[in-house]
């Protein structure tokens, strides 16, 4: 499995307990020889011990980025998620074949799958060069589609469109 570099990119804010569970699962994958190139964690304003835990993890395979005071520059949660996720994406090195796996660190992402099943899933992607990302599915429904901004993944920037409309018209919105 060494011909595919896997990057786990996740955002954290006050999610210490689930973050630990997700990191433990990824460490099991590393022990099984899965080609985990890097775990990238972008934290914004945690105050529950998440930052300290992430700092204790820092090594060649774990990149911890602190992006604090984001509420001063962005007006809503989706803009903050988008900004922080883009910071994480910028740290993926495109030198070899890469599989990007975003991890929502505030949920126990791997509680419903065993390491072997996940490894088998990753192996399926090795031979399919048209896939460069694996997105999590969870119940209850949890998916930050509006925060995804990698070119080619989302054709329309709904946040930007809503922002422009709000400048012209007096409208409200559910997400923006």
Language-model-detected regions and their locations in the chain:
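Cell-envelope/extracellular polymer assembly enzymes that use nucleotide-activated donors
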Residues: 5-7
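Short beta-strand/loop segment that forms part of the nucleotide-sugar
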Residues: 10-11, 35-45, 67
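Short, well-formed alpha-helical segments that are part of the catalytic scaffolds
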Residues: 15-30
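A conserved acidic beta->alpha catalytic loop
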Residues: 15-16, 42-53, 69, 105-107
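Conserved donor nucleotide-binding strand/loop of the catalytic core
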Residues: 55-94
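Glycine-rich phosphate-binding loop signature in dinucleotide/nucleotide-binding domains
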Residues: 92-98, 128
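Short beta-strand-to-loop acidic/aromatic patch adjacent to the donor-nucleotide binding site
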Residues: 96-112
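Conserved catalytic core of nucleotide-sugar-dependent glycosyltransferases
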Residues: 107-176
């Amino acid at each position: 499995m060494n011909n595919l570099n896997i990057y786990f990119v996740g955002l954290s804010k006050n999610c210490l307990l689930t973050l630990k569970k997700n990191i433990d699962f990824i460490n099991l994958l590393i022990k099984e020889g899965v080609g985990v190139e890097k775990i990238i964690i972008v934290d914004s304003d945690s105050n529950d011990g998440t930052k300290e835990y992430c700092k204790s993890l820092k090594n060649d395979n774990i990149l911890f980025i602190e992006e604090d005071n984001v509420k001063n520059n962005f007006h809503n949660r989706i803009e903050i998620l988008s900004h922080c996720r883009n910071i994480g994406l910028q740290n993926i090195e495109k030198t070899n074949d890469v599989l990007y796996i975003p991890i929502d660190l505030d949920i126990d992402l791997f509680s419903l799958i065993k390491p072997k099943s996940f490894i088998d899933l990753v192996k399926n992607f090795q031979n399919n060069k048209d896939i460069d990302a694996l997105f999590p599915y969870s119940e209850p429904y949890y998916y930050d589609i509006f925060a995804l901004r990698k070119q080619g993944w989302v054709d329309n920037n709904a946040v930007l469109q809503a922002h422009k409309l709000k400048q012209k018209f007096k409208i409200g919105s559910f997400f923006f």
